[in-house]
């Protein structure tokens, strides 16, 4: 059996070697918060270096897969209510829920797509 790896594939694999690129760290705040229905809620995400607008926001409820809310920092995913909005670029980003609804009580995550560890 021919086990040679095509050069193009090998090149792609090398891009994914651990440590091949400097990891970008994200810091969310607050780590937790208390809020009531109808409140305006703001969550921030800060990147350790500039990532342009390569940031997404996800909502996760217990036992469920994360749900994409916002991509490219400010673009609303189809089907997501307009009370969710995202802003920012570079290193500082914000997710805002304009009027919190009962179904919005969940965990929220930011994720960057500018580079990979």
Curated annotation (Swiss-Prot):
<dbReference type="Pfam" id="PF07686">
    <property type="entry name" value="V-set"/>
</dbReference>
<keyword id="KW-1280">Immunoglobulin</keyword>
<comment type="subunit">
    <text>Immunoglobulins are composed of two identical heavy chains and two identical light chains; disulfide-linked.</text>
</comment>
<feature type="region of interest" description="Framework-3">
    <location>
        <begin position="79"/>
        <end position="110"/>
    </location>
</feature>
<dbReference type="GO" id="GO:0002250">
    <property type="term" value="P:adaptive immune response"/>
</dbReference>
<feature type="region of interest" description="Complementarity-determining-1">
    <location>
        <begin position="46"/>
        <end position="56"/>
    </location>
</feature>
<dbReference type="InterPro" id="IPR013106">
    <property type="entry name" value="Ig_V-set"/>
</dbReference>
<dbReference type="InterPro" id="IPR013783">
    <property type="entry name" value="Ig-like_fold"/>
</dbReference>
<feature type="region of interest" description="Framework-1">
    <location>
        <begin position="23"/>
        <end position="45"/>
    </location>
</feature>
<keyword id="KW-0964">Secreted</keyword>
<dbReference type="InterPro" id="IPR050150">
    <property type="entry name" value="IgV_Light_Chain"/>
</dbReference>
<feature type="region of interest" description="Complementarity-determining-3">
    <location>
        <begin position="111"/>
        <end position="117"/>
    </location>
</feature>
<dbReference type="GO" id="GO:0006955">
    <property type="term" value="P:immune response"/>
</dbReference>
<feature type="domain" description="Ig-like">
    <location>
        <begin position="23"/>
        <end position="117"/>
    </location>
</feature>
<feature type="disulfide bond">
    <location>
        <begin position="45"/>
        <end position="110"/>
    </location>
</feature>
<dbReference type="GO" id="GO:0005886">
    <property type="term" value="C:plasma membrane"/>
</dbReference>
<keyword id="KW-1015">Disulfide bond</keyword>
<keyword id="KW-1064">Adaptive immunity</keyword>
<protein>
    <recommendedName>
        <fullName>Immunoglobulin kappa variable 1D-13</fullName>
    </recommendedName>
</protein>
<dbReference type="InterPro" id="IPR003599">
    <property type="entry name" value="Ig_sub"/>
</dbReference>
<keyword id="KW-0732">Signal</keyword>
<dbReference type="InterPro" id="IPR007110">
    <property type="entry name" value="Ig-like_dom"/>
</dbReference>
<comment type="function">
    <text>V region of the variable domain of immunoglobulin light chains that participates in the antigen recognition. Immunoglobulins, also known as antibodies, are membrane-bound or secreted glycoproteins produced by B lymphocytes. In the recognition phase of humoral immunity, the membrane-bound immunoglobulins serve as receptors which, upon binding of a specific antigen, trigger the clonal expansion and differentiation of B lymphocytes into immunoglobulins-secreting plasma cells.</text>
</comment>
<keyword id="KW-0472">Membrane</keyword>
<dbReference type="GO" id="GO:0005576">
    <property type="term" value="C:extracellular region"/>
</dbReference>
<feature type="signal peptide">
    <location>
        <begin position="1"/>
        <end position="22"/>
    </location>
</feature>
<keyword id="KW-0391">Immunity</keyword>
<keyword id="KW-0393">Immunoglobulin domain</keyword>
<feature type="region of interest" description="Framework-2">
    <location>
        <begin position="57"/>
        <end position="71"/>
    </location>
</feature>
<dbReference type="InterPro" id="IPR036179">
    <property type="entry name" value="Ig-like_dom_sf"/>
</dbReference>
<dbReference type="GO" id="GO:0019814">
    <property type="term" value="C:immunoglobulin complex"/>
</dbReference>
<keyword id="KW-1003">Cell membrane</keyword>
<feature type="region of interest" description="Complementarity-determining-2">
    <location>
        <begin position="72"/>
        <end position="78"/>
    </location>
</feature>
